[in-house]
Amino acid sequence: MTTTPKPGLVDRRNSGSHKDMDVFTFMDSAAALYPYFEACARMGRGTAERPASETFEALRPLGCEAEGEMLEATGGVNTHKGAVFSVGIVCAALGRLDRALWADAARVLAEVSAMTAGLTEKDFADVTAENAATTGQKLYAEYGITGVRGQVEAGLPAVLNIGLPTLEAGLAKGYDFDRAGGGALLAILAGSTDTNIIARSSRARQQALAEELKALLTETPYPDRDALAALDDRFMAENLSPGGSADLLALTYLLHFITTEGNNDE
């Protein structure tokens, strides 16, 4: 949330392409969701001896309750629905594992994959172009895009292979979290399919934007504040908001801090 500037997203600079929320809305939402994420970790610990899929199924009622808490805290604004799903799963995966394993991001995300195996097929089994109702269902029916379900089922490759190494390489260069995190966000956006961008524009625009960002990052892997602010202005002009990539950035931060703490404990 506080990484700034984040093109098209709520941050300390502005509300991005969102007229119904600001950084304080996000703070209210995050505070309301803290008990949920703790409950997810506890659920993971309590079901650690059972099949991973059972932990995931046990999370779903908690997630529904958390969405209600979020909406109550924000006056009906959806700030963190994606994070309720993805961050909740990662917290439960951490709960299932011995603390000594937290230093290994790949192991944590392998547990995420085990928990959600078969999720995409199960949730989209009966989806067709005719009956697709949600944005996710429509994108799956038209393009075969699996969105966040596909990401978690695959062990969040956009986090493990893109976000985390980009963030940590930037920090190693001496950049602060604004610049290293901004670079990680753009790398995720360039290297994965952000369904929020498609929903606010088109598949063609999302693909073109990804290619544009790949070219930018080849030349400047960590754009400075002015460059990020210019991108922010462009995204707002087009009403673009990479919300899916923002959730993946949040997971990148979570795993960075968890794995760093785990390695420091050794």
Regions found by a protein language model. Give the residues of each.
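Long, hydrophobic/aromatic-enriched structural stretches that serve as scaffold segments
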Residues: 39-95
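Generic detector of intrinsically disordered, low-complexity, polar/charged segments
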Residues: 5, 13, 60, 73, ...
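Alpha-helix N-cap/helix-initiation sites
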Residues: 56, 76-77, 81-84, 102-105, ...
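Short, amphipathic C-terminal "tail helix"
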Residues: 237, 241-266
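Phosphate-rich cofactor/ligand-interacting catalytic cores and adjacent structured alpha/beta frameworks
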Residues: 1-52, 56, 94-233, 256, ...
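A short glycine/serine-rich beta->alpha loop
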Residues: 68-81, 173, 233-242
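Hydrophobic faces of alpha-helical transmembrane segments in multi-pass integral membrane proteins
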Residues: 83, 87, 113, 250-251
